[in-house]
From Swiss-Prot:
Organism: Eremothecium gossypii (strain ATCC 10895 / CBS 109.51 / FGSC 9923 / NRRL Y-1056) (Yeast)
Keyword Amino-acid biosynthesis: no
Keyword Hydrolase on entry: yes
Lineage: Eukaryota, Fungi, Dikarya, Ascomycota, Saccharomycotina
Gene3D superfamilies hit by this protein: Ribonuclease H-like superfamily/Ribonuclease H
Domain Exonuclease per the UniProt entry, residue ranges: 113-265
Region (Disordered): 1-59
Family of this protein: Belongs to the REXO4 family.
Gene name of this polypeptide: REX4
Name of the featured protein: RNA exonuclease 4
Extent of Polar residues compositional bias: 1-11
Length: 285
């Protein structure tokens, strides 16, 4: 192991301090009176045990703070790297899907199918009430066709950046809720809407969509039975179990979540449509 120059300097400095301390002890033993007079004459009082204890405590605290800062920096770096890996895995799945569809490298039209997801921030006391802050829509091939940051009417008390990925800086390019509603409604008109937990997203958008044109991965029977024990499985769990990819490592992205929901639908499209047709044919009867 090769020691750094800083470490070498520190070692030498420590050796000098030890020798100086030993020399001071030797002087004190040989002539205690002289040492005491010298200290008082110089105007520097002898260091008390309490003072030494205080210095040691301060030093220990500083070491702990430095260690915590290093760990936090490493955690942020690891999280950022993990998010990039996850994003790359999802994009690769989308690329493969497009290649199999013969759409690789092409920017297609919106088409009949779209997938949507939203992100929210907190307002009110402690930021517990959710309001819309971003809405993203992708086409059947995972291409982004709409991505809007939405300016909340209320004062944001919790940006939830750690999960939403949204910061105050994003509001510089944000649109009003009314504009977002208008553009999303136009995008969804006469199209099949895919997503995960769409009831909540549509409710927060205050936009309606015909149930016959909704494909919600959170409500898909086979997914609920196999991965949720009859309950609603999370998008994160379905992505891991069905698509073999990890998403939402830390900060969420509505574009990525919309793409994940789209791939989940396409992974079991035949069964999705069979069950959907069965459900709505009963209603008509």
């Amino acid at each position: 192991m090769v020691l750094s120059s800083n470490w070498s300097k520190l070692s030498k400095t420590q050796e000098k301090r030890v020798k100086k301390a030993e020399h001071g002890k030797s002087d004190g033993k040989s002539d205690g009176k002289t040492a005491g007079v010298g200290s008082r004459a110089s105007g520097t009082p002898p260091e008390t045990a309490q003072r030494r204890k205080s210095k040691a405590k301060t030093s220990k605290i500083m070491e702990m703070v430095a260690k915590m800062n290093r760990e936090m920096a490493n955690s942020r770096q690891n999280s950022a790297e993990k998010n990039e890996v996850q994003k790359g895995a999802l994009e690769e799945k989308i690329s493969v899907d497009m290649a199999q569809s013969g759409k690789a490298g092409k920017v297609g039209s919106v088409g009949k199918f779209v997938a949507m997801d939203c992100e929210f921030v907190g307002v009110g006391p402690d930021g517990k009430e959710s309001v819309l802050a971003r809405v993203s829509v992708v086409n059947y091939y995972g291409q982004e066709v709409l991505d809007l940051y939405v300016r909340p009417k209320e004062k944001v008390t919790d940006w939830r950046t750690w999960v939403s990925g949204i910061t105050p800086a994003h509001m510089k390019q944000a649109v009003t809720l009314e504009e977002a509603q208008r553009r999303v409604a136009a995008m969804l008109k006469n199209r099949v809407l895919i997503g995960h937990g769409l009831h909540h997203d549509l409710e927060m958008l205050m936009v309606s969509h015909p149930k016959a044109q909704i494909r919600d991965t959170s409500m898909h029977g086979p997914f609920r039975e196999k991965y949720g024990a009859g309950k609603t499985p999370s998008l994160k769990k379905l992505a891991r179990e069905v698509l073999n990819i990890d998403i939402q490592g830390k900060e969420h992205s509505s574009v990525e979540d919309a793409r994940a929901a789209l791939l989940l639908y396409k992974s079991d499209k035949v069964e999705f449509e069979r069950l959907h047709q069965q459900r709505f044919s009963r209603r008509k009867a």
